[in-house]
Swiss-Prot record:
<dbReference type="GO" id="GO:0048266">
    <property type="term" value="P:behavioral response to pain"/>
</dbReference>
<feature type="binding site">
    <location>
        <position position="617"/>
    </location>
    <ligand>
        <name>Ca(2+) 7</name>
    </ligand>
</feature>
<dbReference type="GO" id="GO:0097038">
    <property type="term" value="C:perinuclear endoplasmic reticulum"/>
</dbReference>
<dbReference type="InterPro" id="IPR033883">
    <property type="entry name" value="C2_III"/>
</dbReference>
<dbReference type="GO" id="GO:0005886">
    <property type="term" value="C:plasma membrane"/>
</dbReference>
<feature type="domain" description="EF-hand 2">
    <location>
        <begin position="602"/>
        <end position="637"/>
    </location>
</feature>
<dbReference type="InterPro" id="IPR036213">
    <property type="entry name" value="Calpain_III_sf"/>
</dbReference>
<comment type="similarity">
    <text>Belongs to the peptidase C2 family.</text>
</comment>
<dbReference type="GO" id="GO:0048488">
    <property type="term" value="P:synaptic vesicle endocytosis"/>
</dbReference>
<feature type="binding site">
    <location>
        <position position="89"/>
    </location>
    <ligand>
        <name>Ca(2+) 3</name>
    </ligand>
</feature>
<feature type="binding site">
    <location>
        <position position="299"/>
    </location>
    <ligand>
        <name>Ca(2+) 4</name>
    </ligand>
</feature>
<dbReference type="GO" id="GO:0005634">
    <property type="term" value="C:nucleus"/>
</dbReference>
<keyword id="KW-0677">Repeat</keyword>
<dbReference type="GO" id="GO:0016540">
    <property type="term" value="P:protein autoprocessing"/>
</dbReference>
<dbReference type="GO" id="GO:0007520">
    <property type="term" value="P:myoblast fusion"/>
</dbReference>
<dbReference type="GO" id="GO:0051603">
    <property type="term" value="P:proteolysis involved in protein catabolic process"/>
</dbReference>
<dbReference type="GO" id="GO:0098794">
    <property type="term" value="C:postsynapse"/>
</dbReference>
Length: 700
């Protein structure tokens, strides 16, 4: 229940703007300004208690407390490492980022790309920090985390060995912004070792809040040139690189002056007429040197003489140092990988860009209720969360004659790096997209069931199920309604996720879920209508006071269930018997009279019938995935979040719900619905309670 309250509070804060870049969430409630001022007033340097200068901050296995790699490590402040430490010298550049003894080259490549754009760098690395003015041993950075911007505070104690920084360091040795940025990122992910292994796109996204896609240029999609042009129009960050096959290859220069293992940026894509035919050209920037392409379409290439002088001047006169043009075919031949980070509208301050439309939806998989696994598990796949996508407007221009609506889908699993310390790692994740059948279009309150997925093929799906933080794909579909189903590969895997959809045109997205509904069959009973046989049974069971208490009810039901072979049960707990009595005890006596007992007896017989019918394997029990169908048979339609709560409350460790817990759940639900209905006679869907009333109902 605490988790639900926290989620509701977070939703309200997000609606008020908390989590935007301007109102970043204070990680672990640490406020940079407050902590720095406290240190300045006390004349002390900040020591971060939440990420201490101890082995636990380094790692858990290879960098664990007893690892040979962590022997002899000392934590030192930059003022202890060199005579004149600087935060940033002459702007952030690639040479500020040299890899240390940690396998986080993916992160460093993303940081290197970040230095190409000063405006975006300043969003992550606030520039007003130094080791001179108002120095208090504290620094702060901002990262995007699953739809929210988070401000992370660190002290400047850094791990060293033999007087040298152990991890990221600058070539000059006196510049520390990159080492402190790495430390802040390690903190938000649990420890330094958690950063080992990853994809550059992960860093791209956490530094920009964008959605990053990448292409192997050996197998480019046929419309890649158009994708690049559109990305540039939208202000996206584009990077390309040439793979290296060994450490010796790093920074090696090819015969046509391209540098291997080097992060280049793509800054232009144009088609020009040359000798009567159209040539596709790509403009590339090498921001860290004068080494430029010497192949066709370089600055001095005769091919430029075949281009209209005005076009040539327009393309070449505005080039910056290190920029050069090359043909698109040469680009595909020489470069290995292209990465595109599509930025969110709030990141782009220039109005000239055509901005993406962005939607983010959060969800979770919970073992036993909404963690259904992939299509290989048809009995549970349908129970995964479902999201409706309404594509209404086609793109303005066609790509290769294909009309439709372009959109990107990114499925991110949350906080998995942070859980590596506990032995967890990335789940294998993916998603499918299904066309909504015509008879269901326009409806958002129907969770598609098992039969739909048994008879319907996915219209699109993620390229693969993979154990990375994010699975991302670009699609183009005709206008219409589609349902997106994210899942882990195997069922029963707990996890939180967010889905982001970037679309060229406005589109609607929302969770698909059953509306809350209770169609409870009312049992009309007058004492005169109750047959004599039941009356005699009641007198025999109730005794002299002609009423049945919860304790007497427990004894009665235990005898009844002991005779049944088709339902496994140890009888009813006293708690279940008490809530059954509470549900029907209208006079407040704490006991059931003849009429009340008759109604309860009728309900229990109905519950038994449902339990047997849902138990298709005749095990005498019900698993948690069958519970959803059983609740529907009993008249309840509930959203996924409530199914998660029910499984957590009423299923055992093996996801079995016995008859006692099944009945307790149904009685609890019926009681809550009745209370709500009595307090909301106008059917507004809302009630108001003071604290005393809330507590009274909560302890039912």
């Amino acid at each position: 229940m605490a988790g639900i309250a926290i989620k509701l509070a977070k939703d309200r804060e997000a609606a008020e703007g908390l989590g935007s870049h301007e109102r970043a969430i204070k990680y672990l409630n640490q406020d940079y300004e407050t902590l720095r001022n406290e240190c300045l007033e006390a004349g002390a340097l900040f020591q971060d208690p939440s990420f201490p200068a101890l082995p636990s901050s380094l790692g858990y296995k290879e960098l664990g407390p007893y690892s040979s790699k962590t022997r002899g490590i000392e934590w030192k402040r930059p003022t202890e490492i060199c005579a004149d430490p600087q935060f940033i010298i002459g702007g952030a550049t690639r040479t500020d980022i040299c890899q240390g003894a940690l396998g986080d080259c993916w992160l460093l490549a993303a940081i290197a790309s970040l230095t190409l754009n000063e405006e975006i760098l300043a969003r992550v690395v606030p520039p007003d920090q130094s080791f001179q003015e108002n120095y208090a041993g504290i620094f702060h950075f901002q990262f995007w985390q699953y739809g929210e911007w988070v401000e992370v505070v660190v002290d400047d104690r850094l791990p060293t060995k033999d007087g040298e920084l152990l991890f990221v360091h600058s070539a000059e040795g006196s510049e520390f912004w990159s080492a402190l940025l790495e430390k802040a990122y390690a903190k938000i992910n649990g420890c330094y070792e958690a950063l080992s292994g990853g994809a550059t796109t992960e860093g791209f996204e956490d530094f920009t809040g964008g959605i990053a896609e990448w292409y192997e240029l050996r197998k480019p999609p046929p419309n890649l040139f158009k994708i690049i042009q559109k990305a540039l129009e939208k202000g996206s960050l584009l990077g390309c690189s040439i793979d290296i096959t060994s450490a010796a290859d790093s920074e090696a220069v090819t015969y046509q002056k391209l540098v291997k293992g080097h992060a280049y940026s793509v800054t232009g894509a144009e088609e020009v007429e040359s000798s009567g035919s159209l040539q596709k050209l790509i403009r590339i920037r090498n921001p860290w040197g004068q080494v430029e392409w010497t192949g066709k379409w370089n600055d001095n290439c005769p091919s430029w003489n075949t281009v209209d002088p005005e076009v040539r001047a327009n393309l070449t006169e505005r080039q910056e140092d290190g920029e050069f043009w090359m043909s698109f075919s040469d680009f595909l031949r020489h470069y290995s990988r292209l990465e595109i980070c599509n930025l969110t509208p709030d990141t782009l301050t220039c109005d000239s860009y055509k901005k993406w439309k962005l939607t983010k939806m959060d969800g979770n998989w919970r073992r036993g209720s909404t963690a259904g696994g992939c299509r290989n598990y048809p009995n549970t796949f349908w129970m995964n969360p479902q999201y409706l996508i309404k594509l209404e407007e086609e793109d303005e221009d066609e790509e290769d004659g294909e009309r439709g609506c372009t959109f990107l889908v990114g499925l991110i699993q949350k906080h998995r790096r942070r859980q590596r310390k506990m032995g967890e790692d990335m789940h294998t994740i993916g998603f499918g997209i299904y066309e909504v059948p015509e008879e269901l279009t326009g409806q958002t309150n129907i969770h598609l069931g098992k039969n739909f997925f048994l008879t319907t093929r996915a219209r699109e799906r993620s390229d693969t199920f993979i154990n990375l933080r994010e699975v991302l794909n670009r699609f183009k579909l005709p206008p219409g309604e589609y349902v997106l189903v994210p899942s882990t590969f195997e069922p029963h895997k707990d996890g939180d996720f967010c889905i982001r959809v970037f679309s060229e045109k406005k589109a609607d997205y929302q969770a698909v879920d059953d509306e809350i509904e209770a169609n409870i069959e009312e049992i009309d009973a007058n004492e005169e209508d109750i047959d004599d046989g039941f009356r005699r049974l009641f007198v025999q069971l109730a005794g002299e006071d002609a009423e049945i208490s919860a304790f007497e009810l427990q004894t009665i039901l235990r005898r009844v269930l002991a005779k049944r072979q088709d339902i496994k049960s140890d009888g009813f707990s006293i708690e279940t018997c008490k809530i059954m009595v509470d549900m029907l005890d209208e006079d407040g006596s704490g006991k059931l009279g003849l009429k009340e007992f008759y109604i309860l007896w009728t309900k229990i017989q109905k519950y038994q019938k449902i339990y047997r019918e849902i138990d298709v394997d005749r095990s005498g029990t019900m698993n948690s995935y069958e519970m959803r169908k059983a609740l529907e048979e009993a008249g309840f339609k509930l959203p996924c979040q409530l199914h998660q709560v029910i499984v957590a409350r009423f299923a055992d460790d093996e996801l079995i719900i016995d008859f006692d817990n099944f009945v307790r759940c149904l009685v609890r639900l019926e009681t809550l619905f009745k209370i709500f209905k009595q307090l909301d006679p106008e059917n507004t869907g809302t009630i108001q309670l003071n604290l005393a009333s809330w507590l009274s109902f909560s302890v039912l």
